[in-house]
Amino acid sequence: MNYEIKYKPSYSMLVVSLEPNETVTAEAGAMTYMEPNVEVKTRKREKSLLGTIGLSLFGRQSFFVNDYTAQNKAGEVAFVSAPVGDIETLELKPNQGYIIQSSSYIASTQNVELDIKWQGFTKKACSDKACS
C-alpha cells in the first residue's frame, strides 16, 4: 500500500494506492473519490458492540467504518479530514500506541485497533474532588 498527502498544509487529501485485494479502513464520510474497481464495505467499528458504542459516544467517532478493497487490479481511493486542515501520518510499531484528538482519525491499515481513553472523565472526576 502506498499513499501520498496532497495539497498540504490546508485542504490536505490522503490518496491511497491499493494493490489487488489490498484493503484500507477509513472513517465514515472521509472518502472523496475512489476508482470503479474499488469495492467498499461498511461495518461497525469494533468487534464488540459496547466498544463501538463507547467510541461513538465518548470518542465522537462514527459508529461505522468503511473498508475499501481493490478488486482484480490496482485501485486508488482518497480521503479528507472532517474539519478542513492538514493531514499527518503516524507510523505504528508493535506494542506502541497513540492518543489522538477525537475526530482526527481518517484512515489506517486493517491491523490498527482503535480504542478510547477516558481522559476527559478522569480529569473532571479528579477536579471535583480537588485532587492535588
PLM regions: where:
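Composition-driven recognition of glycine/serine/threonine/acidic- and proline-rich low-complexity segments
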Residues: 1-132
